[in-house]
Amino acid sequence: MLIKLFGKIFKNSNDRALKVINLIVKKINSLESTIEKLTDQQLSSKTIEFKNRISDGDNLNNILPEAYAVVREASKRIFNMRHFDVQLMGGIVLNRRCIAEMSTGEGKTLTSVLPAYLHSLLGKGVHIVTVNDYLAKRDANNNKPLFEFLGITVGINLPGLNNIEKRNAYLADITYGTNNEYGFDYLRDNMIFNENEKVQRNLYFALVDEVDSILIDESRTPLIISGPIKSNSDIYYKINKLVPNLIKQEKEDSENFQGNGHFTIDEKSKQINMTERGLILVENLLIKNHLMNKNDSLYSSKNISLMHHFISALRAHKLFFKNVDYIVKNNEIIIVDEHTGRTMHGRRWSDGLHQAIEAKEKVNINNENQTLASITFQNYFRLYEKLSGMTGTAYTEAAEFKAIYKLDTIIIPTNRPVIRNDLPDLIYMTEKEKINAIINDIKNCYSKNIPVLVGTISIEKSENISNILKKLRIKHNVLNAKFHELEAEIISQAGCPKSITIATNMAGRGTDIILGGNWKSEFFNKKNINKKRIKKIKESWVKKNNYVIKLGGLHIIGTERHESRRIDNQLRGRSGRQGDPGSSRFYVSMEDNLMRIFASNRIIQTMQKLGMKTGESIEHKWITKAISNAQKKVENRNFDMRKQLLDYDDVANEQRKAIYSQRTEILNSLDIKDIIDNIRKDVLKKIFEKYKTKHSEKINVNLIKIENLIKKYFCIEISILSLYKENKCNLEKLYKNILIIILKKYNEKENKIGSTNLRIFEKNIMIKTLDSFWREHLSSIDYLRQGIHLRGYAQKDPKQEYKRESFIMFENMLYELKIEVITIISNVKIKS
């Protein structure tokens, strides 16, 4: 509903925004002739002038027109590149806490230098966020000469840097890095024991490249720093061997339905559901293989984990596939991002799924991990004071950007009209027929020297097509997660005549495909290059460029429709950049996952009624619309899932912010004596509140309980009954007098140890205990979340129940934390 409503009002609001933006562009253009007359020295000194104006109370919006005019002029002098008006428009949008949708080839990298320079003037730090290390290094090194000419420093934040190198990267005016590295640095900064080890400054402005990929596609996978916990790896191997005994039960409306299966598969949510027959069989198998005692129940607390392992093993075999969801490399399981096709090194599936897949593939099983710190990208990027982003495809997700990140999306017009020919989908009944048609299309283009980019949704499918082309002796390149290192080089040459490139999803995103190939890369990779040689290379490229243009440009082949229209649009957008010609066509079969899982049965029945012959395709508006509706259905479902993830994570996020804030306060404090004093009072007060009673017959019993707890927590021997009588049976007075005794003893300890030593000890204990209890709490709320959906069967709202219970758990954790801190500090022994 939200998405439909958004679509109706989007066009009008976009047009209104562009009218206002155009007025600012005219103002920037009016300054060009004046700025052109400045010497290099005068131009670069404008940065100091702008900073002085800010110090005097001026704001960025007032400075923007002149600042952008200065950057444009600097770009002309340093790069021999002048910002187009549409790039200025993009830069203005990015200053507005918005997302700029800019088509492929429109120069997003050059656009980004405008808001980056403007915000660097505040000296708070600008973070430019890219999807991989290659793009971070490339963009930082490419833009560095321009920024340095204007007196702005540039840092690159890469994995593997030490603390000093990272801190220096963050201290630069503008820092380039990946979303993963920024997020992990934030988590690591909240695990340090010395404030000097912190690398990040306060999070001010993040400019996210390929914003849809980072804030939407990757938002469901949290960043996790974890540590191993002891676990029995043998159990995974043993249960893995039992999986073949179980039979899948078909859906009731299926012609294969017999009702004798052991489990059903929900492909939409990637879940396994056990049938009653299945549960009985699992119980018998576990007993037979001595994994469970004969008289035990599968549902007892000590055996419930066995059922969990069995479900994980079934998911590993039936829902997660090699070269689709993961690859096996160097005896290790590496996850493949379902949206980008890239490998996700260092990421592991949770809940024992990763170990189950390791058992399935017969590789070494790593221990299950305990979460030490975690955060989703949704919550990390919402920590920034100001956030904006750019991408070639944001419109279809505009409602989500607005709902979750409060970011408006503005579509920037192209510098030149898009003349790409987007051909209608060709729909086949079977996968085999579809693949044959795709191969024929490739052969036809190859014979005419037309460059082709073939987009697939998995490594497995890209390699299937590659194997067929090898048999046909058609030269081609394969670009998938297995060949990540060659990604940019392969994709940059995909526009050469006769070039056939097969790529998973949007691998190579961020690198333009130039018709005729990338002539610059030819001399970058060669030694002893001279101007004469460069001229020859460029002349050769011009001929190839003109030749490919005459052929009709780059041809895009989509081997199936993706779950998201946005991913399809990204693939199409690789062709037809900067007014170049191009074409695209998607091939669909009724056996594709999208059609099989999400399309209605009516479509399949209609296709069957048409009586299509083998190899015959159909082009029909109704079918194309049905495919689009299936995609919208999936997009809405995925949006709901991400929104639900955020709703749950927001609960943990509020607790995370409270813990991290307290931790930072302790780290920054030289003396936490006041904090310890307050903890001491709270613990003692809670003891008295717990055993406070008006019944005289219970008072003596309760006083003894108070005495025992005081001895345990505060390491003090007192006769509380005597003190109670001395204080005329007044509990309030008793509390105050005991507090005085506790403080007196602690002060004696301080005199022996020395104040400085005791303060250091208190601080270390406080931080270590806080970290330990927070880790345990993360595990506890994770377990709570995994089972909270069961509350729905009791007519309770799982989300509200999760909020309520996690709050109680958090409150209890904080009190237990106080007890632990005071117990350790009070019980410390002083050695002579």
UniProtKB/Swiss-Prot annotation:
Database matches in SMART domains: SecA_DEAD, SecA_PP_bind
Major localization class: membrane
Keywords, in A-Z order: ATP-binding, Cell membrane, Cytoplasm, Membrane, Nucleotide-binding, Protein transport, Translocase, Translocation, Transport
GO biological-process terms attached to the record: intracellular protein transmembrane transport; protein import; protein targeting; protein transport by the Sec complex
One Pfam family matching this protein: SecA_SW
Tagged with keyword Glycoprotein: no
Enzymatic class: translocase
Protein name as annotated: Protein translocase subunit SecA
Name of the gene this protein is made from: secA
